[in-house]
């Protein structure tokens, strides 16, 4: 008796994520996925009509997991600098546990082959930029930050440098500890935002007082 559809779909998604971390996106075919899952290729097509549909599910799963991890940090009642530090730590931590994330998010071939997949990535970036924009706006209004740049422009800077860090990690085959990049990113953001007396970087999440 076959496995329930939802369970099989999750196996396919999880296996695809593992394969992307190991081999990159370009080499992943439905047959490669089927071999990893241990099923016939026809079983993949039973649950996902095309390879792009598999990657669509993968992108939605990864982005959903990432936002689930960082959303409480964005919505915290802590000061803006503390919230930013916690978001950085959570983002880097999530990516460290899902090495395929940068290889999938930044795959030119994947995006050029499918406007749907490209649209999902654009939505992820827009949602993250919006969240950082609000955090920075809060920091400016509270006096924690003093940058004369608009919150929108500063949010784009934050998102872009985070993307660059993930890309560098992926290009170097995960040869350094991604979470060790947190303090330098945080210090850079604090300087760019002209933060006044920012909270020091800590070894763990800073809890709300």
What are these regions (language model features)?
Residues 73, 105, 109-112, 169, ...:
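Secondary-structure edge/capping motif, primarily at the C-terminal ends of alpha-helices
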Residues 11, 19-53, 57:
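Helix-turn-helix
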Residues 57, 71-100, 151, 155-158, ...:
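Hydrophobic alpha-helical connector segments
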Residues 64-67, 71, 115-142, 152-156, ...:
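Amphipathic alpha-helical packing segments from all-alpha helical-bundle domains
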Residues 140-187, 196-209:
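Hydrophobic/aromatic-rich alpha-helical bundle segments in the mid-to-C-terminal region
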Residues 96-116:
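Amphipathic alpha-helical segments used for helix-helix packing
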């Amino acid at each position: 008796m076959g496995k329930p559809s939802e369970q099989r779909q999750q196996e396919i998604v999880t296996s695809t994520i593992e394969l992307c971390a190991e081999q990159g996106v370009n080499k992943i075919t439905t047959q490669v996925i089927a071999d990893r899952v241990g099923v016939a290729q026809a079983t993949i097509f039973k649950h996902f009509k095309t390879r792009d549909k598999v990657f669509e599910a993968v992108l939605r799963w990864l982005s959903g997991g990432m936002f689930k991890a960082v959303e409480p940090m964005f919505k915290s009642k802590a000061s803006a600098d503390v919230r930013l530090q916690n978001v950085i730590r959570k983002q880097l931590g999530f990516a460290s546990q899902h090495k395929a994330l940068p290889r999938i998010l930044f795959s030119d071939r994947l995006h050029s082959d499918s406007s749907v997949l490209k649209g999902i990535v654009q939505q992820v970036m827009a949602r993250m930029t919006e969240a950082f924009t609000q955090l920075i706006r809060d920091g400016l209004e509270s006096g924690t930050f003093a940058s004369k740049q608009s919150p929108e422009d500063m949010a784009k800077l934050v998102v872009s440098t985070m993307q660059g860090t993930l890309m560098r990690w992926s290009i170097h085959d995960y040869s350094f500890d991604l979470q060790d990049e947190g303090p330098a990113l945080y210090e850079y953001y604090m300087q760019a935002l002209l933060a006044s007396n920012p909270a020091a970087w800590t070894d763990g999440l800073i809890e709300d007082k």
